[in-house]
Amino acid sequence: MDNLRPVLYLSMLLVLFLIWQAWNRDYGPQPVAAPGAQEQVMDRDGVPAPPQDVPDAPVSEAVDAPTEVAPAEPDRRRIRVVTDVLDIEIDTRGGDLVRADLPTYPVSLRTPDQPIRLLDERFRQYVAQSGLIHDRVPGVSGEGRAPSHHAIFQAERDEFRLADGQDELRVPLTWTSEDGVQVTKTYTFRRGDFLINVDHAVRNNSDQPWVGRQYRQIRHGSTPSRESWFLYTFTGVAYHDGRYEKLSLEDMAGKPLDKDVQGGWISIIQHYFLTAWVPFEHEINQFYTRVLGTPARPEHIIGMRSEAQTAAPGEETVFTSRFWVGPKEQAALKAIQPGLELTVDYGMLSFLAKPLFWVLDWIHNVVGNWGWAIIILTILIKLVFYKLSETSYRSMAKMRAVQPKMMQLKDRYGDDKQRMNQALMELYKKEKINPLGGCLPILVQIPVFIALYWVLLESVEMRQAPWILWIQDLSVRDPYFILPILMGVTMIAQYKLNPAPMDPIQQKLMMALPFVFTVFFAFFPAGLVLYWFVNNLLSIAQQWYITRNIEKAGKKG
């Protein structure tokens, strides 16, 4: 056991380092990509070719790529939409969502008036696009009959606000072709909701049939990535086609997506937040991915294209869809579409992290504070493993009691390690001691620790959640390092309660570990340090009680 305990602690230290590296990657300064202009592709006659970022039709069904010529840029406007939970900008070019702020989610507690920004057109960073493409009908030219996200729409005013007492806000944008096809693109916002309805109503006022499809896509301009060795929060493309699938931005070029899916959804995931196009469950769409730009400045697109719909002359057809732009709230996401809640990704220990979050959430609903919920969860975990810990601490207490006999064996056999180990095994057998028993608490804590790390890292409910006094955000480090220092003190106390290793080098190593752990924990989220600190306090109390009883029994005997 003397050799195994330091190895376990060093393994734990390695896990801490990997977690710390991942945490630093997520909360360190983010690099900013330089803006890059989209290259315009010319055909042989020097005329601009159709835009590359508009999806093509299936090969089996010919489709005219949109070739409408956008009016002069002065006709392009920004429409602002403000609800109680969203502050949106819509570009009249394409009717795209080019900015999305979440006023109820500030960037940090120090800047409460600066909201999190998800969609952001600057540097081509993050834009939600949608439009229509026209199928070729024999004898009918599709040119200019369907507005892509390059077309210029008209809006009745420049700002829409959800008024007090109003539950729904509709923002209509209109486009009309030269032959009389009128398209009304309508965004519908609801109070307290991050889900936006997006409809394209096609009114065919021409004398020719209209046949076309709707496409929806999210465009993401990559910034230089910073990978960690082991644990990280996934940022990239995710979709659901009956199964939850992830595709990193780096892999999109080599693994393009192209499949027909009923229902499902497509998304780009960020830490704590999500943007996703969510069709209705009965719809069949073709999911696709594209990578544009240059290797140095790639632009990633994930999208979906609907089946064709027809509007005869004088008739109307409507394309519907939904777009989520907001936090990864598991209950809300699960209610929208099956599998959407899986974007809250707890990593390789999801089977353990999910029940931990469920219990934490239940406790929080009772006590109303995430800090106290973590403390109560720690107590419950300790109760679950009480008997296992009791067995381990009894073994360690017995080891401590026979320490003098072990020192006598060391003096007797000196450097003869073979005879020394044989004598120790006989002593353990005689005293009914399991030399590996003291390692069990460490082994039990490691997976729980990692799972709780994922819960704190991925659950937006924990973001900026206060506890008491100076701890106003359990998802970031203690600003004054008080909890890490207290945690280090508890580790020193635990070291004093445990039997000291016989090897002097191992003794020095075990004495140094509390200080090393304190340094690592100083940069971990306060909620995680709180869990470890309370767990150590409970372990010390349990170990002290068991050790005292065994020592009393030894004196009586």
Curated annotation (Swiss-Prot):
One of its GO terms (cellular component) is plasma membrane. Keywords: Cell inner membrane, Cell membrane, Chaperone, Membrane, Protein transport, Transmembrane, Transmembrane helix, Transport. It is found in: Cell inner membrane. The chain crosses the membrane at residues 3-23, 366-386, 436-456, 480-500, 514-534. Residues 34-60 are annotated as: Disordered. InterPro entries: Membr_insert_YidC, Membr_insert_YidC_N, YidC/ALB3/OXA1/COX18, YidC/Oxa/ALB_C, YidC_ALB_C, YidC_periplasmic_sf. GO terms for molecular function: membrane insertase activity. GO terms for biological process: protein insertion into membrane; protein transport. The keyword Protein transport applies. Its main location: membrane. Interacts with the Sec translocase complex via SecD. Specifically interacts with transmembrane segments of nascent integral membrane proteins during membrane integration. Required for the insertion and/or proper folding and/or complex formation of integral membrane proteins into the membrane. Involved in integration of membrane proteins that insert both dependently and independently of the Sec translocase complex, as well as at least some lipoproteins. Aids folding of multispanning membrane proteins. NCBIfam families: PRK01318.1-3 (NF002352), PRK01318.1-4 (NF002353), yidC_nterm (TIGR03593), yidC_oxa1_cterm (TIGR03592). Belongs to the OXA1/ALB3/YidC family. Type 1 subfamily. This is Membrane protein insertase YidC.
